[in-house]
Every structure is written in structure tokens, then in C-alpha cells.
């Protein structure tokens, strides 16, 4: 079994982990209403996808 010969320093450990950060989802603007949404998905605000209404969304008053 492989065992480290020396203790890994905090600097070396943190340098290795510098690329482990998570990124937020890539959002795009809806061409119909302008709200931000996930790509390749129906807009939750207006219900449009690829230029047509896919889901009927009720207006909140």
C-alpha cells in the first residue's frame, strides 16, 4: 500500500485544490421576455421555448 513519506504542506494541499471550486450554472436571457433561464429549457417566466409557447404560465397579480 502506498503511504506518503512526508506530510503534505498546507500550501501544496491548497494549490492542488485551487481548481476544485464549483461554478454557477450558465444562464442565458430568454429571447421572448428577457428573463434569465437555463439553456435548452423552457423559460419558467413566460413558458416559451424555441419561439413558441410550450407551457401555459399563469400571471401572478
Curated annotation (Swiss-Prot):
HAMAP family: Ribosomal_bL32
Coiled-coil annotated spans: none
UniProt xrefs under Gene3D superfamilies: Single helix bin (1.20.5.640)
Highest taxon listed in the record's lineage: Bacteria
InterPro entries: Ribosomal_bL32, Ribosomal_bL32_bact, Ribosomal_zn-bd
Keywords in alphabetical order: Ribonucleoprotein, Ribosomal protein
A GO molecular-function descriptor: structural constituent of ribosome
Full protein name: Large ribosomal subunit protein bL32
Region feature Disordered, mapped onto this chain: 1-24
Family statement drawn from the similarity comment of this UniProt entry: Belongs to the bacterial ribosomal protein bL32 family.
GO CC aspect terms: large ribosomal subunit
Composition bias, Basic residues: 1-22
Gene: rpmF
NCBIfam families attached to this UniProt entry: rpmF_bact (TIGR01031)
